[in-house]
Amino acid sequence: MENGNGATTNGHVNGNGMDFCMKTEDPLYWGIAAEAMTGSHLDEVKKMVAEYRKPVVKLGGETLTISQVAAISARDGSGVTVELSEAARAGVKASSDWVMDSMNKGTDSYGVTTGFGATSHRRTKQGGALQKELIRFLNAGIFGNGSDNTLPHSATRAAMLVRINTLLQGYSGIRFEILEAITKFLNQNITPCLPLRGTITASGDLVPLSYIAGLLTGRPNSKAVGPTGVILSPEEAFKLAGVEGGFFELQPKEGLALVNGTAVGSGMASMVLFEANILAVLAEVMSAIFAEVMQGKPEFTDHLTHKLKHHPGQIEAAAIMEHILDGSAYVKAAQKLHEMDPLQKPKQDRYALRTSPQWLGPQIEVIRSSTKMIEREINSVNDNPLIDVSRNKAIHGGNFQGTPIGVSMDNTRLAIAAIGKLMFAQFSELVNDFYNNGLPSNLSGGRNPSLDYGFKGAEIAMASYCSELQFLANPVTNHVQSAEQHNQDVNSLGLISSRKTSEAVEILKLMSTTFLVGLCQAIDLRHLEENLKSTVKNTVSSVAKRVLTMGVNGELHPSRFCEKDLLRVVDREYIFAYIDDPCSATYPLMQKLRQTLVEHALKNGDNERNLSTSIFQKIATFEDELKALLPKEVESARAALESGNPAIPNRIEECRSYPLYKFVRKELGTEYLTGEKVTSPGEEFEKVFIAMSKGEIIDPLLECLESWNGAPLPIC
């Protein structure tokens, strides 16, 4: 019998269309695994997003993707439908018929005529009653009075989809009608209530999956949640889903087929990895934006550096950052600054900027590898025993051992923690005026820094997020306890690790949100900085021309040569070091301007003895006029920017990173934060976090990279 991919099911060919009895070129599947890793990570993410948005998920047993699982889990049945491959029906029926035939012939099979686990020495001929008892004793979970101990409905939907996919392959001995019933529950958005805890994911996710079986068999303690959030009894759930014929009386092996699988752990892992892949790309793009607003040197993305390191994740991360920075208006402006007094500045940027490709690259490789591992798992047959109709036998093994889930989730969580650590280091530099190349302390955007502490609370929150994230990076899989009378003496803890990784993803989203809003604040501050610097230069130039050019009798004055050096002072001084009180004698602007005039006076020689040619005599007049004019001009420039009419437009509009800024500022309507407003940072973070959780950030993120050709810039 052929499945939806044209491959014959159950014992005749494997999932890649190869005869099990035939010698193949890739018998160990290493080639298939390697082939799955070809192409760029970004292209893979784009493909995931496209699959996620398709309205139909067609199940045939062997082609399910993590993005399809994420779509079913997240969209609650609205806009996406599950369809079963009719071609799989015959294979499923064949294995179900084989179980009944073998039972009638007196064949001794685990879980069909025997007890379970460490008590498999017991025997019975009451196959149906045995399955009923299996579901009863596995209903050992605790829900309590609220939802704290209930598996999230999204994860339950993911588990239902994955379990259907596994059972469709026809090695499990279950009726097709049961799979159709679960599909109806999914399509009608009716979700069984599963306990959050209680599984060690070997022998499969027995306890939580038994509650799906409990709903199918009408157990009185089973419950479901309907489309509107109303709690449903089994009778109500069946009626609402349109499942006819009443509750199922499980035949031999069917209960075991339902519960003895890794679907809960791998389903949640699929959800986690869909988000983790997107967050990894976001971290790459935000690292590039960080370089822009920090006036970083783009040399750190040079392809030769990364080519010589050989790691593909690093090479791609650097190429993505290089693409964002190539032609960036910020990079062009920063280059001019770096050329000014180069020997007095650090030769290279700090590690959080300069080594971000080297840091992120391995994390992307880990996340990508984990994605492929989980994708193999959700397309695997993972129960026991396996029914091989072609050889007329039940094979007793251990595919229920969810080690790929536990290991991949531990690794993913460590990668997520590393991404968060980099993000925290970058954010810490961004808000610190000792490191951020002229941005104000705490990214304070108001006029009075004594009454505006900007992102100080956000930095404290980021430290909290990062600390918890680093704690979560600790592995789960080394905490295995021997279970079930020492029969399950090693077990994967797959769902526990998936749950912890889900928590880690949520924290990374909190950090990504905070950092992204901080970057947008920095972009706006650079815009303000540019407008204010232009205003200060124009004002200093105007006053210099008026005061320093001519003498009292209209003759040219020696001080006319000071203007160029005065403007150089403005160029060299950080605007936010003095702009709250630009004419203060304790701030660097007035001090350096006076110092410049004094130096010119000292070089003026004998002219200083003459009042009409003395530069020193001009200093007080210059300062007085500047004090009278500059504060007004600065306030006027601020007001113009706040009203949307700045003299100089925002550089971000000329950059490839603009779509993310536009999304945060214009589409979500977040504000430039200052102590002069009532709006708190958390209110703005909330807008971005909710949008990020809904996946709304995906399109602007990918728009930043839509013109990237998938390769580094050529080395010429």
Curated annotation (Swiss-Prot):
GO terms for cellular component: cytoplasm; protein-containing complex. The keyword Protein biosynthesis does not apply. Disulfide bonds: none annotated. Pfam families: Lyase_aromatic (PF00221). Its EC number is 4.3.1.24. InterPro entries: Aromatic_Lyase, Fumarase/histidase_N, L-Aspartase-like, Phe/His_NH3-lyase_AS, Phe_NH3-lyase, Phe_NH3-lyase_shielding_dom_sf. It comes from the Eukaryota. The active site is at Y110 (proton donor/acceptor). It is found in: Cytoplasm. One of its GO terms (molecular function) is amino acid binding. (E)-cinnamate binds at N260, Q348, R354, N384, K456, E484, N487. It is an enzyme of class 4 (lyase). GO terms for biological process: cinnamic acid biosynthetic process; L-phenylalanine catabolic process. It catalyses: L-phenylalanine = (E)-cinnamate + NH4(+). Keywords: Cytoplasm, Lyase, Phenylalanine catabolism, Phenylpropanoid metabolism. There is a cross-link at A202-G204 (5-imidazolinone (Ala-Gly)). Contains an active site 4-methylidene-imidazol-5-one (MIO), which is formed autocatalytically by cyclization and dehydration of residues Ala-Ser-Gly. The modification 2,3-didehydroalanine (Ser) is found at S203. Belongs to the PAL/histidase family. Homotetramer. This is a key enzyme of plant metabolism catalyzing the first reaction in the biosynthesis from L-phenylalanine of a wide variety of natural products based on the phenylpropane skeleton. This is Phenylalanine ammonia-lyase 1. It comes from Petroselinum crispum. The gene is PAL1.
